[in-house]
Amino acid sequence: MLAQSCCLRLLILLLLFTTIGSVPKKSLKYFTNRKLRERRIKLFGTKKTEIQSLLISTWNYTDANLQAWSVLQQGPRRTRQAVIQGCMACQNQRCGRLLTGRSSPDTEGALTLEAAIMDGESLEYGAVAGMNGVRNAILVADAVLKYTKHSVLVGKSATKFARSLGYKEEYLTDARTRNVLKKWRSNGCQPNFWRDVHPSPAENCGPYSPLPEHMHQHPMHQEYAIIQGQHDQLAFLALDAEGKFHVASQSSGAQFRIPGRVGDSAVPGAGIYADNEVGGAVASGDGDVLMRHLPAFLAVEAMRAGKEPDKAAELVVQRLLRHNTEFNGAVVVVNRRGIYAAACAGLDEFHFVVSGGKEYLSMARVERVKCLERENEVIDGGPKGLFPTIPEKHKVP
């Protein structure tokens, strides 16, 4: 038995060495490292592609974009500081109806702010909403991310949290705010966000009481108007040469909103989203619609499923229009290689500012995207004007 066992083992070894000897060294090495190779291809693609730093901001405020870009260029892993700087620059300058304009109160005349920041590496998110009395809401949102296990703080409690960390509280409403509110009230409180109440919110200021359900009307819904230079939200996206993303958004809220309303800037996936493995996206427009559909999140997930940035942006705006035919707004999408695209609806064209990127045409260049004609209900999408189509060599494998 022992002799038979030894012979059997020798036969197996002989067959094994004969098989290995018949396999070329290259093939043997390939099979030995196959799993490692497959993992590398899955994670990184077959070719190593250089990533250029990129800073994108919504609308056409070039000064704020340049300030954020200058921070991004100070060294590696500066994406967080860059998007924060961009938000602070716009909060302390005149960017649309943000705080410096003092022209976006709620119906009671209060100026409340919201902001959010997201880390594309950890997927951590920090935000505040309905916060009154603290100027740079983005700093408080960043503090929520860094110093708490929460994602969003709201209202007076967010203000109290900010004070506990040493942020100065100040009275934000001034004569400009009161004048805006006075004109609105003298115009019958038009426009407003009420519906199916009595007296008719289309003609009266209230107070209102609910109509019986059988009296509810369903007129064509007019979305919140987004006008160049009159918007109340801005978003920033930063990508560095290591492939790290941060996105941030800051808003003074919809003008003449009902007190207590939370906007898209504070809701994960609505105004901003980023994942280093895939890319990032920022959206701007009617915040109540954005919160229902989470377009920034949808855009990133569309890229995860294999869509190029232009097709992802197109897909998202089509989704919004399918359910909200009067939607006003836009989405800007960036993949992990730094290729970007945008799509929009409800405007003649949407502007956003780009610094860096593969083309390096210029810093703080204003890109323009022509929006769709509503009657078509199809996004022609993609770049227009200075915005180049995606070269074949730059497409993600």
From Swiss-Prot:
One of its GO terms (molecular function) is N4-(beta-N-acetylglucosaminyl)-L-asparaginase activity. One of its GO terms (cellular component) is cytoplasm. The keyword ATP-binding does not apply. Pfam families: Asparaginase_2. Residues 1-22 form the signal peptide. Keywords: Disulfide bond, Signal. Disulfide bonds join C90-C95, C189-C205, C344-C371. Belongs to the Ntn-hydrolase family. This is L-asparaginase-like protein CG4372. It comes from Drosophila melanogaster. The lineage of its organism: Eukaryota, Metazoa, Ecdysozoa, Arthropoda, Hexapoda.
